[in-house]
């Protein structure tokens, strides 16, 4: 039974008042990762046996190589992650962390490989001497921002559950590419050219820049023998190769001796453990949607957005999102959502992000009211706040299960990360969102790979007006994330329908929500759903992908009271849909984001 004291109510009321009188953070966040232009030639890829999709074609092919050898979906994901460490170093790698959603054909598993704060971290980590928060670049670049990497431990845990191939085999494509070299892509070249901190790191400069300091050109063959040796050790010794011994010692030394030093130690690395969490599964129409629980906020926020849309339909059938089909558009996508659909998804997003800012953090440290936040009764009350006009800035609600009140977290919203999905011959599936946080992470390079700057995903400010922020820095804590690897099932049959996810910082929630509605409600194939223009709200302006929306749609939204912000929304959505026809034949269709370099491949 839900109960709350008078004192707790007064504290919560104060927090709500704080939120009402503050707008979201005004600090300009880092620019999004550059896209690759918008590819207009993509169509859904089809397969009968298995499929893999990743943000880089070399990674996708590594995944398919494992599937062709009888590997499971997690085998494919491990091979793809290893290759991404090499070919997409700005986005993810073995020096970072990941969340993994896994379907083994019988049950759903959620693996948390999120980085943790070192034992020496304090809540004043990102405060200057005067008590004010650091500027983001001052916090990001260097050892200060490095959390204990977790991706290899999470992959190890998942592999023990459903791996079919030997661990060592999964690193063969990455070792081969590291030794023989790969061609620098246009996107990687652009990101190198745009990053002014690479030149400050001797290791990064030697690897990414020419002798005269210019970025290596697109098409340059880039070899990484140091990383090949690391992969060989990991293949032979398992993740212990990274968390013990000489590699761990060098990681700790590089972090602690950097001019912007951090506290990550060998003991932190030795002590890291991945965690198997209880998946967050909620019903949406005739589907069951499963995502990550805290410390990711992505699963909760997406469940809230979908639940709010469902509640709106129950309250007024004319607001059924399924009836708001996209319309033809002269944009590169060829389609755009209707103003009504953008309005409803943006308003639902505002409500979800208001709750996210107040309640979401590492549930091992903070009592996050997850059940209350996704409860149908609560979402019905939240849906009732949506009208024909935009609410502007939403206030957080008061779900059941609140134990402690916190101040809202108004940290800048980051843009980063990578995504892989796979479905294997047995119908097993994986969705993994993986990251080093900002582009090129902390810019600390160790033996050919980059370390994360995941500590900057904590709130820089530990308290506000006497109230503590839930997502403040604490030793051993995992920072809040928006990563949202998602699996979708048919509620009646229990069969897997889709695996989907995206990079993009806090905008991941917008990207995945859009894709789910497009695939489930609007019946678009995965490629069309991914290619659909991005939009939404993170409880600020209504965000529209630059150059993708008609003047008529923008005016219609303005007429509803929306403040619009046209911005680059460089998602990297990957999705695979699995269907069975009347004769029982299974088929797969996959899509990759036209805004990046990825592809879906299968047999």
What are these model-derived regions, one by one?
Residues 66-67, 153-161, 237-244, 249, ...:
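Alpha-helical support elements that line or immediately flank enzyme active sites
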Residues 24-61, 65, 73-238, 242-244, ...:
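Noncatalytic scaffold domains of N-terminal-nucleophile
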Residues 30, 315-435:
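Internal maturation/activation junctions in enzymes
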Residues 426, 476-478, 512, 521-569:
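Extended C-terminal subregions enriched in glycine
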Residues 6-10:
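N-terminal export leaders
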Residues 19-20:
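C-terminal motif of bacterial Sec signal peptides marking the signal peptidase cleavage site
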Residues 86-93, 99-103, 107-110, 262-265, ...:
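Active-site rim segments in enzyme catalytic domains, especially the processed small/beta chain
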Residues 276, 414-417, 481-483:
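Short, small/polar residue-rich loop motifs at catalytic or cofactor-binding pockets
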């Amino acid at each position: 039974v839900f109960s709350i004291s008078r004192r707790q109510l007064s504290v919560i009321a104060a927090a709500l008042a704080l939120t009402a009188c503050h707008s979201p953070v005004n600090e300009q966040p880092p620019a999004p990762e550059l896209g690759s232009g918008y590819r207009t030639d993509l169509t859904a890829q089809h397969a009968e046996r298995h499929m893999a999709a990743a943000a880089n074609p070399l990674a996708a092919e590594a995944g398919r190589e494992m599937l062709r050898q009888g590997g499971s979906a997690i085998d494919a994901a491990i091979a793809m992650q290893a290759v991404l460490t090499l070919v997409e170093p700005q986005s993810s790698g073995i020096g970072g962390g990941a969340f993994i959603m896994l379907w083994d054909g019988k049950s759903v598993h959620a693996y948390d490989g999120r980085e943790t704060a070192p034992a020496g971290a304090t809540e004043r980590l990102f405060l200057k001497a005067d008590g004010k928060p650091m500027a983001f670049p001052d916090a990001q670049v260097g050892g200060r921002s490095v959390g204990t990497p977790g991706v290899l431990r999470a992959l190890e845990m998942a592999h023990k559950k459903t791996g079919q191939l030997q661990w060592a085999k999964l690193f063969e494509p990455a070792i081969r590419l590291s030794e023989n070299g790969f061609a620098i892509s246009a996107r990687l070249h652009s990101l190198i050219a745009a990053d002014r901190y690479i030149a400050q790191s001797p290791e990064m400069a030697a690897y990414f820049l020419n002798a005269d300091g210019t970025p290596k050109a697109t098409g340059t063959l880039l070899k990484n023998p140091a990383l090949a040796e690391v992969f060989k050790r990991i293949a032979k010794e398992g993740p212990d190769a990274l968390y013990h011994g000489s590699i761990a010692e060098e990681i700790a030394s590089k972090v602690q001796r950097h001019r912007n030093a951090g506290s990550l130690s060998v003991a932190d690395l030795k002590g890291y453990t991945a965690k198997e969490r209880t998946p967050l599964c909620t019903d949406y129409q005739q589907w069951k949607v499963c995502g990550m629980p805290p410390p990711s906020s992505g699963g909760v926020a997406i469940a809230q957005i979908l639940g709010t849309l469902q509640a709106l339909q129950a309250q007024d059938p004319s607001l059924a999102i399924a009836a708001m089909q996209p319309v033809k558009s002269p944009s590169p996508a060829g389609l755009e959502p209707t103003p009504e659909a953008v309005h409803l998804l943006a308003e639902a997003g505002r409500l979800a992000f208001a709750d996210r800012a107040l309640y979401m953090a590492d549930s091992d440290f903070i009592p996050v009211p997850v059940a209350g936040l996704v409860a149908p009764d609560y979402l019905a009350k939240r849906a009732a706040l949506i009208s024909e006009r935009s609410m502007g800035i939403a206030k957080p609600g008061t779900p059941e299960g609140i134990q402690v009140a916190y101040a809202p977290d108004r940290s800048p919203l980051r843009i980063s990360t990578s995504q892989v999905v796979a479905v294997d011959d047995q119908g097993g599936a994986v969705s993994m969102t993986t990251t080093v946080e900002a582009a090129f992470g902390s810019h600390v390079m160790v033996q050919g790979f980059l370390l994360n700057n995941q500590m900057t995903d904590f709130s820089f400010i530990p308290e506000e007006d006497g109230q503590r922020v839930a997502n403040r820095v604490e030793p051993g804590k995992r920072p809040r994330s928006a990563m949202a690897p998602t699996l979708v099932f048919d509620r009646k049959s229990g069969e897997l329908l889709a695996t989907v996810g995206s990079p993009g910082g806090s905008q991941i929630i917008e990207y995945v929500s859009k894709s789910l509605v497009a695939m489930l409600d609007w019946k678009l194939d995965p490629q069309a759903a991914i290619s659909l223009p991005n939009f939404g709200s993170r409880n600020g302006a209504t965000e529209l992908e630059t150059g993708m929306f008609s003047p008529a749609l923008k005016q219609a939204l303005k007429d509803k009271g929306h403040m619009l912000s046209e911005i680059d929304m460089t998602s990297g959505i990957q999705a695979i849909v699995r269907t069975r026809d009347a004769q029982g034949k299974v088929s797969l269709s996959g899509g990759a984001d036209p805004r990046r370099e990825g592809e879906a491949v299968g047999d």
